[in-house]
Amino acid sequence: MVTRLGRIEGLFGRRLDELDYRAIAELVGSSDAAEGEDLDYKQAHYRPDDRGREELAKDIAAFANHMGGLLIIGMAENNGVPSKVLDVDLDDARLRHIRQVIVSNTAPPVPYEPIAVHNPAAPGTGFLLLVVPRSPAGPHAVTAPASRPSKDTLRYPRRGGSRTEWLTETDVATAYRARFAAAAEREQRPRRH
């Protein structure tokens, strides 16, 4: 089951698991489809080095720590507006690598759903959608080694508009309190038999 992201589904006029290549390609030039707190574009796959792993973990955790969101890989943007289709490889090795990076470089691991949307004119290429729900298990930390000097071992990102912000210690404490309160509330609900 694919996560429901209301604003983005409204943009396409359909559920994310029903998207085809053409619907995504038609976003080019649409200011309604500009990057925001629930939408981000990458023109290519993340690099396979430490910096790429850190960036992928940060982008995914930022969505999970905020309101959820959609990352579209294979679309360039100009000032946040989708500007050009740049198909990416959709092979199993790429999908396994992304899964391994997210599981190994976020704590707790961020749940997400990959959707490969193939270009009918170029089999094996197209868009890779990473659908990230808002996570009840947050806050999620990035555990990948920092590519820039940082005093923090665990870094907690979240979306702030079309950018990534970093949670302060107070924000992290508040997020943990909310997680534990929600878990306690679920535990107190009457069980159906």
Provide a role label for each language-model segment.
Residues 1-193:
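Conserved N-terminal catalytic/coupling substructures associated with nucleotide/phosphate chemistry
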